[in-house]
Amino acid sequence: MRSALSNRTPRRFRSRDWFDNPDHIDMTALYLERFMNYGITPEELRSGKPIIGIAQTGSDISPCNRIHLDLVQRVRDGIRDAGGIPMEFPVHPIFENCRRPTAALDRNLSYLGLVETLHGYPIDAVVLTTGCDKTTPAGIMAATTVNIPAIVLSGGPMLDGWHENELVGSGTVIWRSRRKLAAGEITEEEFIDRAASSAPSAGHCNTMGTASTMNAVAEALGLSLTGCAAIPAPYRERGQMAYKTGQRIVDLAYDDVKPLDILTKQAFENAIALVAAAGGSTNAQPHIVAMARHAGVEITADDWRAAYDIPLIVNMQPAGKYLGERFHRAGGAPAVLWELLQQGRLHGDVLTVTGKTMSENLQGRETSDREVIFPYHEPLAEKAGFLVLKGNLFDFAIMKSSVIGEEFRKRYLSQPGQEGVFEARAIVFDGSDDYHKRINDPALEIDERCILVIRGAGPIGWPGSAEVVNMQPPDHLLKKGIMSLPTLGDGRQSGTADSPSILNASPESAIGGGLSWLRTGDTIRIDLNTGRCDALVDEATIAARKQDGIPAVPATMTPWQEIYRAHASQLDTGGVLEFAVKYQDLAAKLPRHNH
C-alpha cells in the first residue's frame, strides 16, 4: 500500500471546479467564502489536493455506529498525512433494533441522501463509515451510483458478551431468551440481564448477524482494507485501521480507482461464497443483489444456488459457538477467504482497494485457530449456502441451511425414504400484531406438525420488509421442549436469529403473491432436495380464493413510506428503488452551478 506523497501523477480533481475555476472566479469566491468560517484557508482548498468526504453514520441514535464519532479523528489524520483534505458530513441514521416500523426503509433513504451529497458537493473521494446492517449496502450503493473513489471502514463489533460464564451473543440471546421466558425457564429480570450482558462495549453485533456479515462482504468485494471487518470496536487496531483507511483513500483518489472498477460479477460471486462459508445473514441476499444492480451487475437465483454446496467453516453464533473477538483473533474474513481461495471457490484475480488482487491480499492469512475457522474439507456443517426455493406460493425464497439444528432435522427432515421432505399444516398470520395476538389461541390447535406463516411483511406490505419471520412456537410447545417450528414468510428475519425459516418470499402477499390466497389449515409440502415449496391446493380453489382479493395491509404513515411503496422492488431483486438503478457513473458529469 503506497504511502509516499511523491511519485503521484498529478490530477485535476472535480473539486477544483468549485474552488479553483478561472472561468468562474465569482462562483469560486462564493464556494470558498463560507468554508473559511471554521478556519480552513482558501490556500488549502485551492491547493489541488483531493477533498475527501467522510460519510459519518455515527450518532447517539445509531449506537452500533457511534464509535465512528471517535474513530473519525484517526481517519482525518490519515487523510491529512497522505495529502488530502478531510470533510466530514452526516448520513441519515440507520439502527435496526429501534427504528419503527423497520430500518429496511432507511437503506434506500440513506442511499438517496448520500447520492445527492457525493454528486452535488465538491467531494473527490469518500470514506464510507459502516457498522449496523444496512449502513454498509447503503453506502456502497451510493458511492457506486456516483462512482467516485470509495473505501469502506467498519466500526467493528462489540466485545464478546458473557453471562454466568456463558458466551451470549447480541441479538441471538434475545431470540433464545424469548423462548426460555415463554417456557417459564427464566424471569423477565433475567431476560433483561442476559440481553444487557450481550452488549458490553461500543460496536455493532458481536455475532455473525447482518452487521458482521455485511462488513465481511465489503472485504470480500474488495472495498475494505484487508482485515478491516472483524476488528472489535474498542481494540487499538480499530483506530490504526481508521488511520490506514484515511491514508489509502487519498491514494485511490490520485489513482482514480472507483467502485465500478472493483465491483465486477466475480467480486459479487466472492461475496456470496463468503456469506455461505461464514454462516452469514439471509439479509445479505437482498443487500448483495441491490449493490450489484446499482453496479450494473445481475445476480440471480442461480448465483445463490451455485454457492449452496459451500460448507460452513466459521464457528460463530448463531450457527456456531463463538463471537467476534475470537473470530478476529482467528483471522477474520481474510482467513475465511483464504480457505475459499485454496479450494478454487474464490476469484483471486479481482482488483481491491489495496491496489493489489484478492490473492495478493490473502497471502499468509491462513487461520491458526481451527476451533473457530474449520478446514474446508472438515467443516462445521456441509452445504451452508442459502437454499433457494420456489413453488406455487412464490417464485423465490431462501432458507439458511447452516442453522438447521439436530432437533429440527430429526423432526422434519429425517423420514425414512423421504429425507429432506416434509408436509405441515399452515397457520397463517397477517402481520406480527396478528401473530402475537393469536399464537397461543387454543382454537388454532398448533402442534409440531404445523408451519407458521406470516404475510404482509414484505417491502410493500409492511412497508420496508420486516424481520418477523422467525416466529417462535406457542407457549405450550415451548414448555414441552419444542423450541422451533417451520416458519415461512414474505418478510425477513434478523441475521442473529437461529431459525431455519423460509423467508424473503417473492412476490409478496401485498402485491398478489401466492401467500395472499393461502389459508390456515392448508397443507404445505416442502422438498429441500428439489427446492420446491407448494401448498397442496387445487387450481380451482386457488382461482376462487384470488377473487377474494389481497389481504389488507397497514396504512401509509409518512411521505417517505408512500414514495417507498410506489417504487420499491421485491426482495428477490434487492428491494431497490426501481427508478434509481438506471442512474450510474454520475460523477462523469458535473452538476451545474447554483447561482
Swiss-Prot record:
Q: In which pathway does it act?
A: Carbohydrate metabolism; D-xylose degradation
Catalytically driven reaction(s): D-xylonate = 2-dehydro-3-deoxy-D-arabinonate + H2O; D-gluconate = 2-dehydro-3-deoxy-D-gluconate + H2O
Pfam families the record matches:
ILV_EDD_C, ILVD_EDD_N
Q: Any transmembrane segments, and where?
A: none
PROSITE patterns given in the database record: ILVD_EDD_1
Q: Which residues form a coiled coil?
A: none
What GO annotations for molecular function exist for this entry? 2 iron, 2 sulfur cluster binding; gluconate dehydratase activity; metal ion binding; xylonate dehydratase activity
Q: Does the UniProt entry include the keyword Metal-binding?
A: yes
Q: Any idea which positions bind Mg(2+)? A: E96, D133, E467
Group of enzyme by EC: lyase
Q: What this chain does, per the record?
A: Catalyzes the dehydration of D-xylonate to 2-dehydro-3-deoxy-D-arabinonate during D-xylose degradation. Can also dehydrate D-gluconate, with similar catalytic efficiency. Has weak activity with D-galactonate, D-fuconate and L-arabinonate.
This one is known as D-xylonate dehydratase
User: Per UniProt, what is the name of the gene that codes for the protein in this document?
Assistant: xylD
